[in-house]
């Protein structure tokens, strides 16, 4: 080892050190969590293995702006995300449980126009009746999104199906 260090410090070529190959096994946890969103039931479910940890009603995308279907993963998680509106003609930033996206947000898909996420809402009625009213995001009651948010990590798989 001193010869290797001396060679590196002197800028000369040092002999290679032979070592036994090490095989690293990257294993997924035996009971990996995943989220399943059933658009027909308008229900989101958290599973660990085959065990259901929670199921909650949701509001989904309007037929003109549907929630995308497919396999996704949680891209990022935000507490007290900022919602920006220009409805009054001026830029206003809203945040917290009474903002249109509540106080928890989890992105799962990006396209050229923005991001799709699972988030809270200022309008619990739409979630309670499981409405199709959003621009493609998934709305949950604020108390429910907090439970789901705390139970999953960035990278958690999300399946959205009909």
PLM features per residue range, with description:
Residues 2-12:
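Bacterial N-terminal signal peptides
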Residues 16-87, 95-109:
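Cell wall/extracellular polymer interaction/catalysis modules
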Residues 5, 44, 55, 64, ...:
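N-terminal hydrophobic or amphipathic segments with adjacent small-residue motifs
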Residues 24-26, 30, 82, 88-162:
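Exported/periplasmic cell-wall-interacting domains
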């Amino acid at each position: 080892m001193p010869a290797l260090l001396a060679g590196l410090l002197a800028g000369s070529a040092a002999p290679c050190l032979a070592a036994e190959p090490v095989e690293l096994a990257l294993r997924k946890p035996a009971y990996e969590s995943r989220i399943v969103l059933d658009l027909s039931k308008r229900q989101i479910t958290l599973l660990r293995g085959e065990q259901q940890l929670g199921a909650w009603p949701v509001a989904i995308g309007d037929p003109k702006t549907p929630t995308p279907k497919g396999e996704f993963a949680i891209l990022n998680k935000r507490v007290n995300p900022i919602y920006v509106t220009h409805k009054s003609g001026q830029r206003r930033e809203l945040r917290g449980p009474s903002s249109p996206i509540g106080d928890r947000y989890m992105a799962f898909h990006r396209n050229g126009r923005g991001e799709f996420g699972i988030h809270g809402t200022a309008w619990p009625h739409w979630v309670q009746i499981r409405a199709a009213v959003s621009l493609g995001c998934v709305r949950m009651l604020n108390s429910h999104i907090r439970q789901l948010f705390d139970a999953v990590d960035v990278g958690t798989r999300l399946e959205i199906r009909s």
